[in-house]
Amino acid sequence: MKRLAAVLLLLAATASAQQTLIRTQKPPLHGSHWMAVTGKPLAATAGAMIFQKGGNAVDAAAAMIAATCTMWDTLSWGGETQALIYDPHTKKVTGINALGVAPTGATPEFYKGKGFTHPPDEGVLAAVTPGTPGGIMTMVAEYGRLSLKDVLAPAIEMADGYALEAQSANTMDRNKEKLKNWPYSKKVFLIHDDNPKHPGPVAGEIFRQPDLAATLRKLVEAEQQALKKGKSRKEAIYAAYDRFYKGDIAREIVRGTREQGGLFTEEDLANWKVHIEEPVTTTYKGIDVYKLNVWTQGPAMLQALNILENFDLKGMSFNSPRYINTVYQAMSLAWADRDFYYGDTYAPPEEPVLGLLSKDYAKERAKLINPDHNDPKIKPGDPYPYQRGVNPFPDLLRNWDTSKPPASKPGGTQDSGLRNEFLRATPSLSNDYLFAFYSGTTSVEAADAEGWAVSVTPSGGWLPAVIAGNSGVGLSERMQSFVLDPSEGPYNVVAPGKHPRVTLTPTLALKDGLPWLVFSVQGGDSQDQNLLQFFLDVVEFGMTVQEATEAPNINSFQMHSSFGGHDIKPGNILLNSSEPPWVRGELRRMGYTMTFEDRTSGPINAIMIDRPHGTFWGGSSNHGEDYGIGW
């Protein structure tokens, strides 16, 4: 009898294990020394190589960014980098703002004079100054352990030639007609003149970028020359930084940009700098959640958490109609504030950050959530009284209209779809919607046993990118996130030297004062929507990081798009195709216009630090090429 009982227990345990194994399409990643998770297998390998060289999580993250920049379909070297770093020595979380700024001459009048109602979403006039090179070098100089030569070695080897992956090859092929318009891009990407139908490289072909390789070697050369002169490791890396932004590399970027009709000046690059800054934070169920400031959309997730703290989400059950309705409206409230109040914190007017993140303000906003019906006309609130201030834009706030999209952009390309990271919901989503989850932006997560933890959301310069002369550097397309009219966002109106308000949003969470979760995602306006739900899946519903990356999400289109024509579709919701009929019926009754897809999230990547066991859990998206390596 005892033997039978033992057999039954063993069978039950085996069945339980099998159920656990089939809960996710990908297994969770485990490690005890270090972990690197990102959107490209080769980039994850670059991170692993740096760890094996003795680098820390910051070095590994920088190498992953550099490698991904060399592969083009999600970002390139002229884009922007945003990071959160936990330093185990200071026990502080620090933010890295390596976002470019609008160049000289980029004014509302300039773009309106060319017939635009918003800055363009591609081409040379869509470019802000390059930020990622400065971001990588600052991260390594201030928080890394290795030389720039070590950190850039994988990217340089790739620029010399690597076996092109299918996704990048397909992206080049899709954009071949546009790449023909820009001579330096054509030289790099359309290398087979004898095959006009498919002039780009194919999957498996060795893809070489000699101009980019030369530029990266110039950075290493500047570092090594400084070291020979007796400079410190940090000083030598900043010598490379100066060569990029103030030396011959900068001059070629400016020359190549202006030759193709761009606005960059040498002063634009020389005056730009990386900001090392204090992030913003809130608490949820005793967990400290950190985001970059309101020059990103990241604080909208914190606002949503503050609102949702007033509800029993676990009691509603996962993805029930009541839960979906509550989360949707909380996001709508937070993103309405994002659309109105968020902007560059280094340029006037000053944003009401304290009021926006006030718990009392969140309680008042939470009262607006209707448990029975969605409100498609949710408007921004007024956070100023919660920081003892007076709203400087009362008329714009009073007249804010969420019921209709802005006018179409004359002469623009807002409907081409492939550059937009998050497209408008339609009754039948096109393939462009699915491409949008793959194109533009990646996420980079790294952690090590020493205690370093890093979350990065680099982006910009994705295909079809304009390459700046013979530098090999592709230009960003981030100007499109500005507005030209204060009525569409008084804090985010374009001006020379100003950062656009971006969607890019790394996340770092502490438990008991120590790193617990690092996570981020690509997907434009959906980024913090999906990260919010990932976080709730882990905290409220006890999912592992792999389960939470694969869990079905909802996406709202009730906020203004940060891309193209800045469209808005109140009441539109994207749901997973697995939602049962009774859930669909309830949401229809609540006033939602529903669209369904098998994929409802950009690729979330995450690392959880398991302190009781001294190990790491990694999660990477089951869609696309996202990949992790741990040891």
Where are these regions (language model features)?
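Positively charged n-region of N-terminal signal peptides that target proteins for export
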Residues: M1-L4
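Hydrophobic h-region of N-terminal signal peptides that target proteins for export
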Residues: L9-A17
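Noncatalytic scaffold domains of N-terminal-nucleophile
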Residues: Q18-T45, M49, N56-A239, F244-T296
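Short, well-structured alpha-helical segments that form the helix of a local strand-helix-strand
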Residues: V58-M64, K149-D160, F244-G247, E252-V254, ...
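Active-site rim segments in enzyme catalytic domains, especially the processed small/beta chain
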Residues: T70-G95, K112, R255, Q260-T265, ...
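Amphipathic alpha-helical
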Residues: Y238-N271, E364-R398, L463
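Internal maturation/activation junctions in enzymes
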Residues: L313-W452, V456-S459, D598
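Extended C-terminal subregions enriched in glycine
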Residues: E450, G497-P500, L531-L532, E540-R599
